[in-house]
Amino acid sequence: MTETASTRASFVIGDEAAARRVTDLLGESFDDGELAIAAFERPDRSWEVSLHFGEMPNLDGVRALVAQAAGDAAAAAMTVESIAAKDWVAASLEGLVPVPAGRFVVHGSHDRARIPSNKLGIEIEAALAFGTGHHGTTRGCLTLLDLVLRAGPPRSVLDLGTGTGVLAIAAAKALRQPVLATDIDRQSVAVAKENARLNGVGNLVEAVHATGFSAPVFAAWGPFDLVLANILANPLRQLSTPMSQHLAPSALVILSGLLQPQAQSVIAAYRARGCVLLRQIVIEGWSSLLLAKTF
């Protein structure tokens, strides 16, 4: 790519929903060759959004778009810097380093050739950086998934709240068998499908829009021998009953998306439904749980 000077703008906003609104609006407002967008969750659960422009944009217009999507405070807090002449698309990927977790390595396309042959690479583009594996919950889930798969292949696998599809892709690549991935957000379902295709498992990951366990697809695929759910503590507690009803005997469950102080209440909710804790991993203050159904 021809080297040109570029402009980087960044700001921090309160939550994932706001980050999605910003990235959606800016993505619609600029051509692919004009702008690269990356959004990353921070330890305090706020989101940092980085915008890399190939040429100096109309900054007043950019601030207006940010204000429209995320409010005046985010627009006012936006910082702007000039990046020396180089490949500005590559610059947008500098913070997206490969993340190892067990046998898996989550990476961007710029690191594709650097993944060791004894690892399973999961490629997620920076422009689709919601759930890239850089958050402690995703790394914890992948580590536990690697542990579970060493004990033998589950027959039926569900990734509930799939997001970008990282966990479903990991399971499909390791098992070479179909995996069901569901999400309440239609955009996430579309992203998961595309990521599965890019990772060579588009024919193995069935990504479906579904809320909770009410959709017919759960009965068609279940009961499940392995469920992965990297969502939030409250939904995990609320789903303990319907999830337990869709588990096969001796099924394993990997849960995350909860802060360490929230873990005990989630463990208690699933214990009441016949699931016992086998292992807990804490990464950067976030807990990932491995449970087994006992009855």
Curated annotation (Swiss-Prot):
Its keywords, alphabetically, are: Cytoplasm, Methyltransferase, S-adenosyl-L-methionine, Transferase
Binding, S-adenosyl-L-methionine:
138, 161, 183, 230
List the EC numbers from the record. 2.1.1.-
A molecular-function term among this protein's GO annotations: protein-lysine N-methyltransferase activity
Alphabetical GO CC annotations of the entry are:
cytoplasm
User: What's the name of the protein?
Assistant: Ribosomal protein L11 methyltransferase
Q: Which cysteines are joined by disulfide bonds?
A: none
Q: Spell out the Pfam families in the cross-references.
A: PrmA (PF06325)
* The reaction(s) this protein catalyses: L-lysyl-[protein] + 3 S-adenosyl-L-methionine = N(6),N(6),N(6)-trimethyl-L-lysyl-[protein] + 3 S-adenosyl-L-homocysteine + 3 H(+)
Function of the molecule: Methylates ribosomal protein L11.
> What family does the Swiss-Prot or TrEMBL record give for this protein?
Belongs to the methyltransferase superfamily. PrmA family.
Where does the protein principally reside?
A: cytoplasm
Q: Can you say where in the cell this protein is located?
A: Cytoplasm
Q: Which InterPro entries does this one have? A: Ribosomal_L11_MeTrfase_PrmA, Ribosomal_PrmA_MeTrfase, SAM-dependent_MTases_sf
One of the protein's GO biological processes: methylation
Q: Which NCBIfam families does this chain map to? A: PRK00517.2-1
